[in-house]
Structure formats: C-alpha cells, structure tokens
C-alpha cells in the first residue's frame, strides 16, 4: 500500500511551510472531504525541524527523540473524556544535506516504541537513507491505535538517527531533519480507512531510502538511548491558513538545534561508538544490513528524562 503519489509529493513538498502539509488529509482518511469540515478540523498536524551540527568530525547520533512535544501530548489528553483512541495517519521523515559533495553519503533512521522493554517487539521500522539528491524521504502509517489516557503516550514513538559525518569544524550545521505527523482522535477504528479502503500497516520509501530488517545492530542501537547531541529548542511556531467556509487550518511546529553538548566528552568515554566507527568496521555497502553481537557494545537502557533532568545543562527537545 502506497501512502503518497511520489511524483506529486516531491513536487509539493518544497513549496509548503511544513513538509507534512505535502500530504493531504483526503489521502489519509476516506471521510476527510470538503463536505465534512468537522473531520478535517479534527486532523491535527505537528512537525519537528532539527538542524544537526558537526562534532569535530565524529559521527552524529540523535537518539530517543520524541515525535510530539509536551504541548501536543497535553492537548491529546484533554480530549480523552471525549475520545478513547489516538491514530497516526502518517509519519513523514525528511533528511536534507546542507554540505557540498553530499552524494553517496548515508545514514540510518530507527523508529521504535520507547515504552516497550523488548527491542525486537518494540521495533517499528528502520530505513537506510543515501543522498542521491539533497533530500531523502520516507513515510509510515501505523496500523495500531494508542490510548489517549496512556501514561507513556510520549514514549510510544521514538527516533534514533545516525549520520555519516565528514570532518567539519564543530557546530557547523550539516543536516536538517524534519519529522512531521498527521493524527486524529477517534472512538472507533472504522473511521481509519484511506480513500482506497486500506487500513493496515504501510511504509513507503519515497526518495533516497531503503527499508532495513531488524537485526542485532539495530537492537543494540535501540537499547543505547544516550544522546551525545545536545538539543536546544526554540519557541514553538503556530502556522495559520485562512480558509473559506471552514475554520482556519492551524498547525504547530518546533525548531530544534542539535549540537555537541557540555556532557558529550563524558559520554564518549563511557563507550559510545560513533556512526563513523561502524561504517569503517562494516564497510559502507554493509551499513545497516549486517550485525555482529560480538562487535556490538553493551547497551544501556536509560531514558532522556533521567539523563536530561533540569540542572544538568541538557534538554530532551520537548517544551517545558
């Protein structure tokens, strides 16, 4: 099941304020039509825009990253007395290279359930991205719903992103990462079919991406939830689009800077292996396709909330 028409998406995505706006609501839900403004108004959109800076030539790793911020989670929980379930119509991931000679560079994105203690069962999907143009995209449409009253709702979709980083001066912004989501709250799964009648799991490599199977390397990456990049979040952005005969279209986004933090050197001494080390060991043509338990470092399962508490000079990328 294809989530988007690739040619139409690639044409639209560069002309929208948010990447997630390149996917229309009518593509996600069959009842999202012009004649049902209430349905269109209940489909919410949120996007995180992350600028990733270099770390003195080391490989870059962004781990345990939240799909939604606290403001969005609070808004969903306030609707729990009216709606029982939360459904993600689509999650869109875009990676943009902002450096010369980017063609052939690659990396990996792992999406997983941060509340699941079993990495294999909690693994949602993984993609290898390789720059043939300056942007790579993939999308996924989960089959399952989540509870609006789930105490661990913020943990249910987490991301780990590994970048192959060339040698640059520290804090040079090299990559832009856009993670957007369109979702709705419902009381019945019968409202979740697309306009083609599909309601099952879907994952699509839109441009420059290739799906990866779960393996030992991905397992160890999920277990190692330390983030050597310091996340610095700016003020949230509200995007309002005026519409005739219907309510205004309101979307939220957040801008985040990911760079080397004050504790990065300490984390490296604890055994963190950069992406550059993995690529050198396995070879670029094997990245993400091969795993060796004997070569993988012991994983530590710690949450961003524990390692980034106030007073330690870190942030988890969500609103205060």
Curated annotation (Swiss-Prot):
Keyword Transport: yes
Record-annotated active site: 144, 171, 199
Protein name: Probable movement protein
Domain of life where this protein originates: Viruses
Entry EC number(s): 3.4.21.-
Gene Ontology terms describing biological process: proteolysis; transport of virus in host, cell to cell
Family: Belongs to the tobamoviruses movement protein family.
EC main group: hydrolase
Renumbered residue ranges of the record's region Disordered: 251-270, 286-320
GO molecular function: RNA binding; serine-type endopeptidase activity
Function field: May play a role in virus cell to cell movement by increasing the size exclusion limit of plasmodesmata and forming a complex with viral RNA to assist its movement. May also have a papain-like protease activity and cleave the genome polyprotein.
Alphabetized UniProt keyword annotations: Hydrolase, RNA-binding, Transport, Viral movement protein
Pfam families with a match to the protein in the record: MP
